[in-house]
Amino acid sequence: MNKKILETLEFDKVKALFEPHLLTEQGLEQLRQLAPTAKADKIKQAFAEMKEMQALFVEQPHFTILSTKEIAGVCKRLEMRADLNIEEFLLLKRVLLASRELQNFYANLENVSLEELALWFEKLHDFPQLQGNLQAFNDAGFIENFASEELARIRRKIHDSESQVRDVLQDLLKQKAQMLTEGIVASRNGRQVLPVKNTYRNKIAGVVHDISASGNTVYIEPREVVKLSEEIASLRADERYEMLRILQEISERVRPHAAEIANDAWIIGHLDLIRAKVRFIQERQAVVPQLSENQEIQLLHVCHPLVKNAVANDVYFGQDLTAIVITGPNTGGKTIMLKTLGLTQVMAQSGLPILADKGSRVGIFEEIFADIGDEQSIEQSLSTFSSHMTNIVDILGKVNQHSLLLLDELGAGTDPQEGAALAMAILEDLRLRQIKTMATTHYPELKAYGIETAFVQNASMEFDTATLRPTYRFMQGVPGRSNAFEIAKRLGLSEVIVGDASQQIDQDNDVNRIIEQLEEQTLESRKRLDNIREVEQENLKMNRALKKLYNELNREKETELNKAREQAAEIVDMALSESDQILKNLHSKSQLKPHEIIEAKAKLKKLAPEKVDLSKNKVLQKAKKKRAPKVGDDIVVLSYGQRGTLTSQLKDGRWEAQVGLIKMTLEEKEFDLVQAQQEKPVKKKQVNVVKRTSGRGPQARLDLRGKRYEEAMNELDTFIDQALLNNMAQVDIIHGIGTGVIREGVTKYLQRNKHVKSFGYAPQNAGGSGATIVTFKG
């Protein structure tokens, strides 16, 4: 859309109204780049996003986003192979933290159905390793000691050396007290010195670093600390070198993910902008309009967002209506009405809410053109007329059936008779070309044109003859009338003079009486409409109250169900604990094999309550294709997601299978056949085993962050069994810090698991108390 219309309608000022609700620099940048579009799918997407965010706010009224700074330049530097500084790493750290918080929020969100917003939440990346690396930089811009063993070693040596310097100086302060001007340790040129009286300067061996202005005090670094100070200076240089090395190393770790982090930052900004739109809706009682497919416009109680105490009006621009001509005297708000229509349409096509009532509809226009100028503040002259006509000629050459045209004081600035004729001719040309137009004029000749011409409608701005002031109410279907006689009479002009004047234009008086009757009918209709709206608002409030009550009842129901599930889980936990003890006794007596213990536990775990999501049940979606199994078939063990091969069938119908290094006995329902063309292994949901090659041998990792307690404990148990089946020696369990409930549950589980040799928190630079490293018995 052309930039001129955006400047004319002051669209930038409108966008500025949303800025106070933004929390991120990415959101601010997207707001500033926002412009109207004629693509219906993009507008519909923006409207759907706002509606979903409104629903989200009903359940989570305090939803917020962590404030972030712009990182486009940082990511660009990474792509150019530059190393980042601490401040830049802190910007990235903030973005990753904001992304993690949004992912956790989405994972725990309930009672809200999201489609458009879900796409954005689910596109956010998870970088646990990078987040761990960036913990090396604290918010004060300091590299933590745990960033590397070398840095920690250097800083320990610096600390020890500085302690020695302090001890030596304190001893000298006591021993040489009479030789000092003050009993303190001073600092000169980064060195620790003693303030020695000039008369004793030769009594204390060392390096002179400064002399006072009076010459009475000499600042000497004692010989005893010179060597230590030099060591400290050397260590400081080593520290700086190591910090540069750390910056380079972490830059290399972050570099491959620069594009993904930049994309996450954009998504965070986009969600922030949607959130700001909804906050604006709440603050200004705005609405998300409906979208018309045929350029029909219906604005209910619409008002201009930049006008304080603006009067709300109704505007209906039907599908067949091509022009609305607002007639009547100036100063009544005609130009504001024109701008309100244009600006509302621009806001909607930019994906913004509008200041109107629910039920409002907007069209889609490829272009909006306007010739708007304040004719009352400039001298009427040929140059003014020429300027307007030049603009109109240019517009007439560009408009088409997909355009909206706004013309202010059409035909003004020249002879009234010629100006009125030109105005009618221009409107007729636009009507024949089926171009939607709203025009204002003070020429009375255009009233007749609006009445006599098909698909053209008159309109006016209401004037209160009692107060002699405009009310700024838009009266569609009613042409403007002159109030000169009424105003003159109220201002004290002789009734004789007013009577003589009215007799000279009796025909016009008849027209004015008709217009007056139309105004009365319009006012009566407006009152009835206002009453209907009041009833609608009451119904809307009642509907919201009922929805709120319904949601509260659902939440209470879910709470009770959760309590019941927790109680059931406790019972099952007790049963599993007892089963562990029984199996332990059996193992000690008959030396059962590990896989037999795991099989027994899997059968016991079937007692645990499971949540059934029918919407994701693939059995209900399509029939399961399956043939009879035979020896040599490749299978997938359903309990663990592990592949194996059938080796023989037992007499009781069960099958023996080789799964990795372990032989297992399975019922047919406990495995699925792998199709010949199937290449990818089946992944068990949320139990992500990642094998890595390192000096410690195979490892695995389980991420329990964002999970509920019951779900986390079930996944942990399955994960440990899988690790044992894979003959792994060590695994990592990421549980986060949070409230500590999951962490405590993990600890209790590991304490009672007889296969666990030892466990403990990860190093600080690998997750600290947010992760546990588990070592199994050999």
From Swiss-Prot:
SMART domains: MUTSac, MUTSd, SMR
Keyword vocabulary terms for this entry: ATP-binding, DNA-binding, Endonuclease, Hydrolase, Nuclease, Nucleotide-binding, RNA-binding, rRNA-binding
SUPFAM superfamilies noted in UniProt: DNA repair protein MutS, domain III, P-loop containing nucleoside triphosphate hydrolases, SMR domain-like
Record: residues binding ATP: 328-335
Similarity section: Belongs to the DNA mismatch repair MutS family. MutS2 subfamily.
Native species: Streptococcus pneumoniae (strain ATCC 700669 / Spain 23F-1)
Domain of life assignment: Bacteria
Protein name: Endonuclease MutS2
Molecular functions (GO terms): ATP binding; ATP hydrolysis activity; ATP-dependent DNA damage sensor activity; endonuclease activity; mismatched DNA binding; ribosomal large subunit binding; rRNA binding
Record's keyword annotation contains Hydrolase: yes
Biological process according to GO: mismatch repair; negative regulation of DNA recombination; rescue of stalled ribosome
Function: Endonuclease that is involved in the suppression of homologous recombination and thus may have a key role in the control of bacterial genetic diversity.
